[in-house]
Regions:
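Short C-terminal tail/terminal secondary-structure segment
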Residues: 115, 197-215
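Residue(s) in the substrate-gating loop at a strand-loop-helix junction
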Residues: 110
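Substrate-binding pocket helix/loop in short-chain dehydrogenase/reductase
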Residues: 67-68, 75-77, 166
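Canonical Rossmann dinucleotide-binding motif of NAD(H)/NADP(H)-dependent dehydrogenases/reductases
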Residues: 1-12
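Alpha-helical segment proximal to the catalytic Tyr-Lys
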Residues: 96, 138-143, 194
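A conserved structural motif in NAD(P)-dependent oxidoreductases
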Residues: 170-181, 192
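Active-site helix of classical SDR
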Residues: 91, 126, 134
Length: 215
């Protein structure tokens, strides 16, 4: 979102809690994107305050990693609700605004939609569903709205610093950084990507294409 704000977009961030360091110029609105009434209030507020909605970026995501026998239905539903159902609710509520603006939707999935680790069933299912939802929406909202998906791999954060071996494992020679995803999001939001819709972009430094052999 900081990239979009820097590029001159009027940015509204929806979050359950106010971010510690929101991007300069962005407006933060409290919203539970897995809750239908909360999403309706968010979009109604954008309509009133901004009068239009050009781009919707759906990047809410959580993960609960447990063995399947220990994963409760409530935990499963929480992950699916936040990672998948939220995008359905947001697009449904914003459809009229997006069609009027000839806008764009960018969803943020994950390479876990294509490759898995143990005990990630809810997360993998939600992200795989989001990829499918993206191309379905691209057809349903055409020709007024473009819908595309970004599937990041390992994106380094302050709480998860990569080691030298982690960088070397990636064909690109490094682990991803938030700016890698932000740059593609900005491109898909703008007019330069006007002939792109229904696509999934894998941003993982080449890892999903790498053959891995037993040591």
């Amino acid at each position: 979102m900081a990239r979009l704000a820097h590029d001159g977009w009027s940015v509204v961030i929806a979050d359950r809690e106010r971010p510690h360091h929101p991007p300069a110029g962005a407006r933060v609105v409290r919203c539970d994107v897995s809750d239908e009434a909360s999403v309706k209030g968010l979009i109604d507020g954008v309509r009133t305050a901004e009068g239009r909605l050009d781009v919707l970026v759906c990047n809410a995501g959580i993960s609960i990693r447990k063995p399947i026998a220990a994963l409760s239905l409530a935990e499963w539903s929480c992950v699916i609700g936040t990672n998948l159902t939220a995008t359905f609710l947001l697009v449904r509520a914003a459809e009229t605004l997006l069609r009027t603006a000839k806008g764009a939707v960018v969803t943020i999935a994950s390479t876990r939609a294509r490759m898995s680790e143990a005990d990630t069933e809810a997360y993998a299912a939600s992200k795989g569903g989001l990829v499918a939802l993206t191309h379905a929406l691209a057809i349903s909202l055409a020709p007024d709205v473009r819908v595309n998906c970004i599937s990041p791999g390992w994106i380094a954060t302050k709480g998860d610093p990569p080691r030298a071996a982690d960088h070397a494992f990636h064909p690109a020679g490094r682990v991803g950084v938030p700016g890698d995803v932000a740059a593609l999001t900005a491109f898909l939001a703008g007019p330069e990507s006007g002939f792109i819709s229904g696509a999934e972009f894998i941003v993982d430094g080449g890892v999903t294409r790498k053959m891995i052999y037993p040591a």
